[in-house]
Amino acid sequence: MDKESITNAEENSYDKPNNNIRPQGFDDFLGQNNIKSKLKVFINSAKKREVSLDHILFYGPPGLGKTTLAQIIANEMGSNIKATSAPIIERPGDLASILTTLGEKDILFIDEIHRLRTVVEEVLYSAMEDFFVDIKVGEGTSAKSFRVKLPHFTLIGATTRSGLLSTPLYDRFGIVERLEFYTNEDLANIVKRSSEFLNINITDEAAISIASRSRGTPRIVNRLLRRVFDFATVHDVLKIDEKFACDSLEKLGIDKNGFEALDKLYLNTIIKHYNGGPVGVDTLSVSLSEQIETIEDVIEPYLIQCGFIKRTPKGRVATNKAYGYLNLSSKYDDNYSNEERGLFDF
């Protein structure tokens, strides 16, 4: 999948940094109400006892607010935050140098934490549990190791693939929360909030239309809002209504479900090339010329959430909803025509 795809929930060049849009506190963070209510309790408890917050793991599809929540937690705790990404931390010494710069109750945020190398991850064990690191100096027989005490800090890890975390690392997180896709109502409220900061005049109906095509993801809803605003600016439209929003999104190649060409190709491949499934992700990766990680983390989560495909032990299976979306009769239906059956003859 093109990383610059407008409905790719991973961060890309469409996402212009805007500190005004990014929520700074829980009151500004719309959605994920269950998680927010629990985090408020944990934070208030830690502040009342004057201790650092337990280590936190956020997991779920990209673009749902894991990084933003980490920043909000730092703000609520009155703590400094150091943000990094697992692929950047190549050696144990890289991690040790980061840890030794932290202050008491500071927060270390590691994105894509499932991608930590094992030798780096092992440094975290003692750091998270006992707040020390052993630093090795020198090489060979002359090498020496000395122990450095660390302040009581909070590690916040974020991942789209919690299943890839090792058990020793996973078990050291005291708080583990899964972020879910957002409702259209929450996304429409995000559109209206962002519109105020960006000075965009938009109707409630247009906000709902943009929200419904945003794949349950705040990052995408803000991205689509900006692109619709681009069309409005070029065409001298002073107020974005529902029709203008829908027309603009259609021009961007995004249908009412929030699907792009690759989503349709994915469904067509399963149904027309593999008889609706089951088909393995390795095979799909070859057929689509996409990495397995992209299929599993970017394409499939929303299709599964919407009920278009199922993951089974034998592979991916298209549902009746997928057949209907492509205007095909399901192979399990009595109305399945001979012509359509021919699509699956090899």
UniProtKB/Swiss-Prot annotation:
SUPFAM superfamilies xref list: P-loop containing nucleoside triphosphate hydrolases (SSF52540), Winged helix' DNA-binding domain (SSF46785)
Region (Head domain (RuvB-H)): 256-346
Cross-referenced CDD domains: AAA
Region (Disordered): 1-23
Record: residues binding ATP: 21-22, 63, 66-68, 129-131, 172, 182, 219
Binding site for DNA: 311, 316
Subcellular location field: Cytoplasm
InterPro entries per record: AAA+_ATPase (IPR003593), AAA_lid_4 (IPR041445), DNA_helicase_Holl-junc_RuvB (IPR004605), P-loop_NTPase (IPR027417), RuvB-like_N (IPR008824), RuvB_C (IPR008823), WH-like_DNA-bd_sf (IPR036388), WH_DNA-bd_sf (IPR036390)
GO cellular component: cytoplasm; Holliday junction resolvase complex
Keyword DNA repair in annotation: yes
Polar residues bias: start-end ranges: 1-22
Top class in the EC scheme: hydrolase
Protein family: Belongs to the RuvB family.
NCBIfam families in the cross-refs: PRK00080.1, ruvB
Name of protein: Holliday junction branch migration complex subunit RuvB
Species, as recorded: Brachyspira hyodysenteriae (strain ATCC 49526 / WA1)
Gene: ruvB
